[in-house]
């Protein structure tokens, strides 16, 4: 039975899934189509939801994960059966470690064919149970709307994360006659009276306090109020790895990033501070340099997170405040503290170091091969104040991490699980969500080719990111560690690359290859102007192998 032969007044379960996603505010889904969820695809035909057809399930999952960071609604992807689910798994792992709200719908074999090793059969629960918040399989058509509501709630509640929903092919074509389930309210927590008193007392006692912000569970208004409160009290705040922008790059309270690629001073500050207040994050592996920093039990650590389990946390916990960042900030801004010259001096000293560390290199090119520093300097000068940047994993990320001025919450989008192949899909998602904003994508040669095919998606749907591919002919981060542990024994890290500019042109974008530093400013200008005229653009920047940002 298909949707055209159902009794009057009913919808198929597949169509009801779409109606329920609409009711939850979903505006865009990322799909690689499959026969097993054709009825849901048919429901999308008449839907207000935009269907973005991607070229690989990994790209679809990354785009959905990026949407979970860019918006206050879980990102949604749809793939089919075992092969599609396997390819999408990388995006789920990113959502799990990055605490990103995301729902992956997977078309499954017919219900009656289970456990017979049917074509492309797999067991979603055994595959995903350890890396998803919930794994659900639609077992009755009348539960279609209910299961969407449960999935969206599970992805958003507590510590956000990925949810997997299996859609058996024969179940979604059957009639659904019940009502659309409304969104389930998500608890936001908040400071108790004792939380308030203890935090205020700790701040008043501290001489060198530091806020550390992170995670995806903020709102734009909460980020702005948080920045204003910090500035009013002359208090410093540092960013968790790849979470810049929640406190503006130009804020006098912003003192730099912590984690991989961080400046040395922010690592020292973790131990020098007499009070750390983590908001939306915990002192985990990356933030503490492999569980080495801030492990002394005589220091005060306050942790603000809605996750009572404190998953991934290391070191002492003086007090946990169970609250989402936005609710915590609502309470915090009502806390008025007297002026404190010691705080001001502490903050100003850290801010001065940060300004020096992140100051743009010269825009003027020098003699010799193309340089990433020249490219970043010329690019940043062109970008609007609300520009966004996306990147994946590798040596190329260090330039964006250091020099990109993330002025707004969710203006720096990356994979905190260190997943390669993230840069282009996330840039496409960002450009589609914010078509009026500049979107810069920084990719490495190894990382780019893992999902560079999503340039086709950019061309098909009018996304206009500016992509800079840093080509150092190697897997740079791995090579760096290899040289430290096995000096002068190069094995398995070298690359021979195609002409990425010609690839971009073949996909319908603007592409230019640069080998000399003198060519960089004009190439960046041409590429940027191409994005302003409605094309995606790519600059293939061929640099020296052992190039370093710091």
Give the positions of each predicted feature.
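Active-site diphosphate/adenylate-binding microenvironment
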Residues: 14-17, 24, 32-35, 40-45, ...
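Glycine-rich, anion-gripping cofactor-binding loops and their flanking helix/strand elements
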Residues: 69, 215-302, 405-437, 449-453, ...
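Glycine-rich phosphate/diphosphate-binding loops that line cofactor/substrate pockets in enzymes
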Residues: 15-26, 66-72, 96, 154-159, ...
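Thiamine diphosphate
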Residues: 35-111, 114-120, 272-284, 313, 322, 398-475, ...
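Conformationally flexible catalytic loops at phosphate/diphosphate-handling active centers
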Residues: 122, 150, 154-205, 358-359
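Glycine-rich, acidic loop regions that bind phosphate or pyrophosphate groups
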Residues: 106-146, 243-349, 527
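Phosphate/pyrophosphate-binding active-site segments
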Residues: 1-8, 178, 197, 201, ...
